[in-house]
UniProtKB/Swiss-Prot annotation:
Outcome recorded upon mutating Y546F: No effect on phosphorylation by ABL1
Quaternary organization: Component of a complex, at least composed of APBB1, RASD1/DEXRAS1 and APP. Interacts (via PID domain 2) with APP (with the intracellular domain of the amyloid-beta precursor protein). Interacts (via PID domain 2) with RASD1/DEXRAS1; impairs the transcription activation activity. Interacts (via PID domain 1) with KAT5/TIP60. Interacts (via the WW domain) with the proline-rich region of APBB1IP. Interacts with TSHZ1 and TSHZ2. Interacts (via the WW domain) with histone H2AX (when phosphorylated on 'Tyr-142') and the proline-rich region of ENAH. Interacts with MAPK8.
Modified residues (Phosphotyrosine): Y547
Compartments where found: Cell membrane; Cytoplasm; Nucleus; Cell projection, Growth cone
Taxonomic source organism: Homo sapiens
Protein name: Amyloid beta precursor protein binding family B member 1
InterPro entries: APBB1/2/3 (IPR039576), PH-like_dom_sf (IPR011993), PTB/PI_dom (IPR006020), WW_dom (IPR001202), WW_dom_sf (IPR036020)
Biased composition (Acidic residues): 145-173
Compositionally biased residues, Low complexity: 287-299
Ranges for domain PID: 370-509, 542-699
């Protein structure tokens, strides 16, 4: 016969007060955690004790039997006493305590089987009536004969004794020590208390908080299914003890990113979602608990707040006040790493001292100053500055100088200012280069004379600035390259603003001069709200040539006229007498400029060009212009390597101008002609009517159209 193990203290008290005072050899109280263990639900009375109670021969002595019963009862008392302190509902008993309690056991008298069964039946009924927290298990409420009880006890005695001994050994080795308490004070706790009893220990880690429910899942689930088959009114441990309720997770704005506050029966703790680590203290405070496992420390080092080697618990977060400081450093790294050379001040002294030594930098608000380092200059040709090629040529110069200047502090021989720290100032329509220490003016370049400027387009060249201008002494086109402390687009934007201002001032001055010569009485008031369209810049092509001069010719057209003029000039002059110049071809104007002085040698309107051709020599080119009534002039050029590009450009300009004239003439003919008088309209209508009548009658009279036209 198996003995029930789910009887509580209330059942035993009711049994002791409701009947005669009995001295029970077996304490029948069982803790709630024994109901969740599959191995303990079939705990049986030792076969030797049953044989002695039934009076069978060959049984053991009364003393050892009573000691066995008392030992089992005290073990159950210890398990019940420590149930509210064990988080995983494990039986808490050690071998040392078991050995220490054995000498204190007092021998009790043997009991008969019938008397023992009556006590068990009465206790089971009382436990069911009082509605215990765990479902009471009644073995049988029917009467059973002595023979049936003897057969069942004899068949199960040996197996139950072996299971009981193995179970006690496993529980003693795996459970923490617990102290027994009096029987009257043992009660099933209303809710399992995992981490709230007593002060919190720092040795609790994430495995304790997150692994409670999975530590004994198989045994717990199977045992509960067996115990609750007959009592559906009670809930399961999952229902009565919910660690994860909907309100358990809280997010707070005070917590750093990635942290969450969790509240459950164990208390309030903080969970770092990316790494999976937990801690009792808020993450924004001094340091984590001392119980952080080595695995948790290795996960914390992944965030990059410290080096990869090991740290002590007290030293790991010592130098890090918060999680925001490393983020600020991470934002600064891409900005400092954009340059290929080390980030350093462009002057030997720190920048604050340099600013103190340079008071004029910020005194005049009209001066824009930029700290730069000269990389030198590269000579350029006029062909490289042609439209569509200038940006590529300037970028090649930047690439050529910046890639070969690995050490910027080593000055190179060649041009002025090479490898030096300079101040680039934009003042009064002038670009100035000033020595930082002595404020000495090294170079001044009028902004209006700068041909091209640009910023490096390659990756890492955003701080390289270059401009192209003609040298005053050598008349050579030079591309000066600088490396700026700030992004070079600031200089380019400032230059663009200054050029726009200069062009606006010149436009206003030209309008003022023209306005003085106009009759103000004929001017029409224009409202100020009207927005005039911005003028479009025409495409200008420049070609470097030798200007042979111009001669008057008799006819405006003819290849023989051009060939005769070219032969006469080539035979009468030498190459040294030819003037180096360049021709600017625009859709409206052809301009001939001196290559060195940029003086205008000739300017011709495309609308007055009458004929153009290439001479017998492919290097020669000439065109004829109308200089006045019955006066024509032939301009001649020597081109390298041939005159094909120049002739095509002039021809394209002529065709474009001719097309514009046609467009303007067609619009004027449709919209600008005055309306015909009424008399002319009447004559035209009458003529149309007469013509219709004549066509009907088949008249073949000739029509005089000129007489009837207005």
């Amino acid at each position: 016969m198996s003995v029930p193990s789910s009887l509580s203290q209330s059942a035993i008290n009711a049994n002791s007060h409701g009947g005669p005072a009995l001295s029970l050899p077996l304490p029948l109280h069982a803790a709630h955690n024994q109901l969740l263990n599959a191995k303990l639900q079939a705990t049986a009375v030792g076969p030797k004790d049953l044989r002695s109670a039934m009076g069978e021969g060959g049984g053991p002595e009364p003393g050892p039997a009573n000691a066995k019963w008392l030992k089992e009862g005290q073990n159950q008392l210890r398990r019940a006493a420590t149930a509210h302190r064990d988080q995983n509902r494990n039986v808490t008993l050690t071998l040392a305590e078991e050995a220490s309690q054995e000498p204190e056991m007092a021998p009790l008298g043997p009991k008969g089987l019938i008397h023992l069964y009556s006590e068990l039946e009465l206790s089971a009924h009382n436990a069911a009536n009082r509605g215990l927290r765990g479902p009471g298990l009644i073995i049988s409420t029917q009467e059973q004969g002595p023979d049936e009880g003897e057969e069942k006890a004899a068949g199960e005695a040996e197996e139950e004794e072996e299971d009981d001994d193995d179970e006690e050994e496993e529980e003693d080795l795996s459970s923490p020590p617990g102290l027994p308490e009096p029987l009257e004070s043992v009660e099933a706790p209303p809710r399992p208390q995992a981490l709230t009893d007593g002060p919190r220990e720092h040795s609790k880690s994430a495995s304790l908080l997150f692994g409670m429910r999975n530590s004994a899942a198989s045994d717990e689930d199977s045992s509960w299914a067996t115990l609750s088959q007959g009592s559906p009114s009670y809930g399961s441990p999952e229902d009565t003890d919910s660690f994860w309720n909907p309100n358990a997770f809280e997010t707070d704005s005070d917590l750093p990113a990635g942290w969450m506050r969790v509240q459950d029966t164990s208390g309030t703790y903080y969970w770092h979602i990316p790494t999976g680590t937990t801690q009792w203290e808020p993450p924004g405070r001094a340091s984590p608990s001392q119980g952080s496992s080595p695995q948790e420390e290795s996960q914390l080092t992944w965030t990059g707040f410290a080096h990869g080697e090991g740290f002590e618990d007290g030293e790991f977060w010592k130098d890090e006040p918060s999680d925001e400081a490393p983020m600020e450093l991470g934002l600064k790294e891409p900005e400092e790493g954009t340059l290929t050379f080390p980030a350093q001040s462009l002057s030997p002294e720190p920048l604050p001292q340099e600013e103190e030594k340079l008071p004029p930098r910020n005194t005049n608000p009209g001066i824009k100053c930029f700290a730069v380092r000269s990389l030198g200059w590269v000579e350029m040709t006029e062909e490289e500055l042609a439209p569509g090629r200038s940006s590529v040529a300037v970028n090649n110069c930047i690439r050529q100088l910046s890639y070969h200047k690995n050490n910027l502090h080593d000055p190179m021989s060649g041009g002025w200012g090479e490898g030096k720290d300079l101040l680039l100032q934009l003042e009064d329509e002038t670009l100035k280069l000033v020595e930082p220490q002595s404020q000495a003016l090294l170079h001044a370049q009028p902004i209006i004379s700068i041909r091209v400027w640009g910023v490096g387009r390659d990756s890492g060249r955003e701080r390289d600035f270059a401009y192209v201008a003609r040298d005053k002494l050598t008349q050579m086109l030079k591309c000066h390259v600088f490396r700026c402390e700030a992004p070079a687009k600031n200089i380019a934007t400032s230059l663009h603003e200054i050029c726009s201002k200069i062009m606006a001032e010149r436009r206003n001055a030209r309008c003022l001069v023209n306005g003085l010569s106009l009759d103000h009485s004929k001017l029409v008031d224009v409202p100020f709200q009207v927005e005039f369209p911005a003028p479009k810049n025409e495409l200008v092509q420049k070609f470097q040539v030798y200007y042979l001069g111009n001669v008057p010719v008799a006819k405006p057209v003819g290849v023989d006229v051009i060939n005769g003029a070219l032969e006469s000039v080539l035979s009468s002059s030498s190459r040294e007498q030819w003037t180096p110049s360049h021709v600017s071809v625009a859709p409206a104007t052809l301009t001939i400029l001196h290559q060195q002085t940029e003086a205008v040698l000739g300017e011709c309107r495309v609308r007055f060009l009458s004929f153009l051709a290439v001479g017998r020599d492919v290097h020669t080119f000439a065109f004829i212009m109308a200089a006045g009534p019955a006066s024509f002039c032939c301009h001649m050029f020597w081109c390298e390597p041939n005159a094909a590009s120049l002739s095509e450009a002039v021809q394209a300009a002529c065709m474009l101008r001719y097309q514009k004239c046609l467009d303007a003439r067609s619009q004027a003919s449709t919209s600008c002609l005055p309306a015909p008088p009424a008399e002319s309209v009447a004559r035209r209508v009458g003529w149309t009517v007469r013509r219709g009548v004549q066509s009907l009658w088949g008249s073949l009279k000739p029509k005089r159209l000129g007489a009837h036209t207005p």
